[in-house]
Amino acid sequence: MGRNYKWLDKDMLTPRQLKLFNYLKEYKKENNYMPTYKDMMKYMNIKSSHGIHQMLGYIEWKGYIKKYPAMARAIEILKEVA
């Protein structure tokens, strides 16, 4: 049996990626700015900022968001989940 590489499917988000993506949208809607990595870590119950960084990287690679690394909380939603 082969491995399941759903996280590499460029057309869809994994359940955890979708959970983070929806959190970003709701947080932005309620606060008019994006959450910090610490906020995301708490929401996703992840102990390391590297886990959030990696998950955001895959969501960006799939074309749902754009990160602007030189600015704090600079994440732009590019498209909605179908």
PLM-predicted stretches and their roles:
Residues 60-68:
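A short, conserved structural fragment
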Residues 56-57:
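Short, hydrophobic-biased segments on the C-terminal half of alpha helices
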Residues 26-32:
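Short helix-capping/hinge SLiMs at alpha-helix to coil transitions
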Residues 14-17, 31, 70-82:
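Short, cationic-aromatic polyanion-contact patches
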Residues 35-46:
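A short alpha-helical element within helix-turn-helix/winged-helix DNA-binding domains
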Residues 1-12:
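Short, Lys/Arg-enriched N-terminal segment that forms or immediately precedes the first helix
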Residues 19-26:
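Pre-recognition alpha-helix immediately N-terminal to the DNA-recognition helix
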Residues 20, 51-52:
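Helix-turn-helix DNA-binding helix
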